[in-house]
């Protein structure tokens, strides 16, 4: 079972009574056929549920009102099968607070050249019915997605699936609770921000709990529970000699297991799905949570270090979006560079907390090494390299008057040399279009040093996320040129200042 099983998407057909009962029966039959086919053949993440035809203002308003109050409804897919006068939709769309996708399709793929008549034309009017619906959306400044294509087309299936993932993530974020163990790393700017504004804009709440509250739960974990989790470690990872039974760091592994179980219990009891820690606030914990955080991220929790609640929330959102897709998604940080003409590289990592969902190794290495930051005992961690291929890194920042999402398209590459003295998980990539352009654009746009790294999601996913939440997006990819990028930032400043 995945999070998508908790939701459904309503399929709504727009028409009108002008065409008579016979035509409306045909419309209903077509809709039933299309919904059944999409549910069985399109590999959609959510089930489509066909609703009654929308043929009058009252019917349409009732559907939209019911969608708002149904917790299982993640959004609406609307198909204008015939012409549906758009003034009928005004009241419904004005109250709708769920995501909306217009599926610009028609029942037949090919025109029946020899038999086409006006009955056929009146029945299959998506071509101009969809435009009428589009006008009222533009007139009302109603943000909605549009997918054009035949309902049997796999590209259309893919795009609807991607939108469904966004719709579900939007419902999840409205319920998201972020737990901060301690506060921000002292004097750091980008990890701070306006939590009230974030809750108003996105819906997620951010609150702080004392590390001492967590320590109480950690200390209550039984040896039996720890032993069971250690057995899972043994079967899932390659343990270094120091971490095996009778190894001199075995107790550190047991303590890491205790911390993992304690954090998870705390999060479950509080209904949290994202959290932060900071190495400056570890009072009562014997080590910085490393292995614990890595494993919890792999289970779908959002996380970021140093109290960075925005990145923790973004990671949770992107984890939900990417559920069931190939490739992983992780907390990440641009750590250091390799400058080589024509082969500039970024080495991404963090002190410990990189999610093993992006690991290339089937069984990452579990080790315990010294960590100079934090002043605690040596922490356990998983060490691995990252899968190669196209990926993105994304950052959500608070500019005071708005949120900006930065996305850099990257190409992850194989590490050309062993890293025998680097005891942390890492990712190596080439930034698009090149490191100088990408880094300068990122810096000019105010991008954070913390990011969410993903092989599973792409730029289109993040564009759709920004549109659905009505926030700014700044893209750095192979089409980026600094003069144009700077102009876009200036235009965005003007646009959002006028908008708000």
Curated annotation (Swiss-Prot):
Q: Does the keyword Lipoprotein feature in the UniProt annotation?
A: no
Q: Name one GO molecular function term.
A: manganese ion binding
- InterPro entries assigned to the protein according to its UniProt record, in alphabetical order: Ara_Isoase_C, AraA_central, AraA_N, AraA_N_sf, Fuc/Ara_isomerase_C, Fucose_isomerase_N/cen_sf, Lara_isomerase
Pathway the protein contributes to: Carbohydrate degradation; L-arabinose degradation via L-ribulose; D-xylulose 5-phosphate from L-arabinose (bacterial route): step 1/3
Q: How is the cofactor bound?
A: Binds 1 Mn(2+) ion per subunit.
Query: Sorted alphabetically, which SUPFAM superfamilies does this protein's record hold?
Result: FucI/AraA C-terminal domain-like, FucI/AraA N-terminal and middle domains
Q: Say if the entry is tagged with keyword Transport.
A: no
Q: Which cofactor does it need?
A: Mn(2+)
Question: GO:BP terms for this protein?
Answer: L-arabinose catabolic process to xylulose 5-phosphate
**Top-level EC class as recorded in UniProt:** isomerase
Catalysed reaction(s)? Answer: beta-L-arabinopyranose = L-ribulose
Q: Cellular component terms, GO, for this chain's entry? A: cytosol
* EC number(s) recorded for this UniProt protein: 5.3.1.4
Entry keyword set: Arabinose catabolism, Carbohydrate metabolism, Isomerase, Manganese, Metal-binding
> Where along the chain is Mn(2+) bound?
306, 333, 350, 450
Subunit structure and binding partners: Homohexamer.
Biological function: Catalyzes the conversion of L-arabinose to L-ribulose.
Q: Which family does it belong to?
A: Belongs to the arabinose isomerase family.
**What is the official name of this protein in its record?**
L-arabinose isomerase
Q: Which gene encodes it?
A: araA
């Amino acid at each position: 079972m995945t999070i998508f099983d908790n939701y459904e998407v309503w399929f709504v057909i727009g028409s009108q009574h002008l065409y008579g009962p016979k035509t409306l029966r045909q419309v209903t039959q077509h809709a039933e056929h299309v919904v059944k086919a999409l549910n069985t053949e399109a590999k959609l993440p959510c089930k489509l549920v066909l609703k009654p035809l929308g043929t009058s203002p009252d019917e349409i308003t009732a559907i939209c009102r019911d969608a708002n109050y149904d917790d299982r409804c993640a959004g609406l897919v609307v198909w204008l099968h015939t012409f549906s006068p758009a003034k009928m939709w005004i009241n419904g769309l004005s109250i709708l607070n769920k995501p909306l996708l217009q599926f610009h399709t028609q029942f037949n793929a090919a025109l029946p050249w020899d038999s086409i008549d006006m009955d056929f034309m009146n029945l299959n009017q998506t071509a101009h019915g969809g435009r009428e619906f589009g006008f009222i959306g533009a007139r009302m400044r109603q943000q909605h997605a549009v997918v054009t294509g035949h309902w049997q087309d796999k590209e259309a299936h893919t795009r609807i699936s991607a939108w469904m993932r966004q719709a579900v993530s939007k419902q999840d974020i409205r319920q998201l609770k972020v737990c901060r163990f301690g506060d921000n790393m002292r004097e750091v700017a980008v990890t701070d921000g306006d939590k009230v504004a974030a809750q108003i804009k996105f819906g997620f709440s951010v609150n702080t709990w004392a590390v001492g509250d967590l320590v109480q739960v950690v200390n209550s974990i039984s040896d039996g529970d720890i032993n069971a989790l250690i057995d899972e470690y043994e079967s899932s990872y390659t343990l270094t000699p120091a971490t095996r039974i009778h190894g001199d760091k075995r107790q550190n592994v047991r303590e890491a297991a205790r911390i993992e179980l304690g954090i998870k219990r705390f999060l479950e009891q509080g209904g949290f799905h994202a959290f932060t820690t900071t190495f400056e606030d570890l009072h009562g914990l014997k080590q910085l949570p490393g292995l614990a955080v890595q494993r919890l991220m792999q289970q779908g929790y959002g996380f970021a270090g140093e109290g960075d609640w925005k990145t923790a929330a973004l990671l949770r959102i992107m984890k939900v979006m990417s559920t069931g897709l190939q490739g992983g998604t992780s907390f990440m940080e641009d750590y250091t560079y390799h400058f080589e003409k024509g082969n500039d590289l970024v080495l991404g990592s963090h002190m410990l907390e990189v999610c093993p969902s992006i690991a290339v190794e089937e069984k990452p290495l579990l080790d315990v090494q010294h960590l100079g930051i934090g002043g605690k005992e040596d922490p356990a961690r998983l060490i691995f390299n990252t899968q190669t291929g196209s990926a993105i890194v994304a950052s959500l920042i608070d500019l005071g008057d708005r949120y900006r999402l930065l996305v850099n398209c990257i190409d992850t590459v194989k590490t050309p040399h062993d890293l025998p003295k680097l005891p942390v998980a890492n990712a190596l990539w080439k930034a698009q279009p090149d490191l100088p352009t990408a880094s300068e654009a990122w810096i000019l746009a105010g991008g954070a040093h913390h990011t969410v790294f993903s092989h599973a999601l792409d730029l289109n996913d993040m564009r759709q996320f920004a549109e659905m939440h009505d926030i700014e997006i700044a893209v750095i990819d192979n089409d980026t040129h600094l003069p144009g990028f700077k102009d876009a930032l200036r235009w965005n400043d003007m646009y959002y200042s006028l908008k708000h």
